[in-house]
Amino acid sequence: MTMPAARPEETVEDERRMPFTEHLSELRLRLRNSVLGLLVATMVSYMFRGPLFALIARPLIQAWSEASRQGALPPPEMVFTSPVEAFMVLFKLALLAGVFLASPIIFHQLWQFVSPGLYDREKRLALPLVIVSVLLFVGGGLFAYIFVLPKAYEYFLGYSDPSMGIIRDVLGRQELWGHKVDIRITESFAIKPMITMDEYFGLTSTLLLLFGAVFELPMLLGMLAMLGIVSPGGLWRFNRYFILIAFVAGAVLTPGDLVVGQLAMGGALTVLYNLSIGVAVIMGWRKRRAAAAAAAVGEEAAR
């Protein structure tokens, strides 16, 4: 009886199996390369810290300038409350820019670590997957920067009030030139923002990274579908539950009581999840087609 020949891809992959120690060595190598890429990107970004801070402060400055033109606020400004705060904020800004700048290297190193466990036909997806991952991550950050942050700071600055008046009873009822009168003093004060560099950068960077990570959802579910862990039908049946989960996650993950950010994240998650179903359909179709082609080759070799 003739035994069916092993698929060439499986033979090659069996030869490439690594012991656990080699997996650890490979992980250290990929982490080292990612960290080196991030350090170089951070140093380059720090050289442009001034323009970068002006860029990241633009959503706040635009909202503040509009309120200032309407007479509700003084000209925009930011303060720092400790000697090292400005330096630390600019360094963290350079690090954040370095993450986006080095994201092609980081995603490529991640793929290089995962790829030894994949067949050759799946490895051919490396470059498209890296490109799409980078575009989704950067696209999520841009979505937050263009649509979420301006509305967020317009909403927060709306709590300011240039002339909030109160009446304080200072002396009470007194006799003045033979007459009983109520002596009161009306005081007026303003509620104005005094935003520190650290607080602004903390909220802004959190939203940028959060939306960047959320936009990776189609890639994550697409890879799970390619590995056979999830199916398009299962994802579609879970859709109505995911919509609820998406808006709850938006309320939990978005900092503060930022309603605009919560709705934007919930809506973005819902759209991305449905896009992921389409990606899973394509991945499943490609996998079935490749399996059918491999089976045909195996049958041909067995004859």
Segments the model singles out, each with a brief description of its role:
Residues M1-R303:
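Membrane topogenic/interface segments and analogous intrinsically disordered interaction regions
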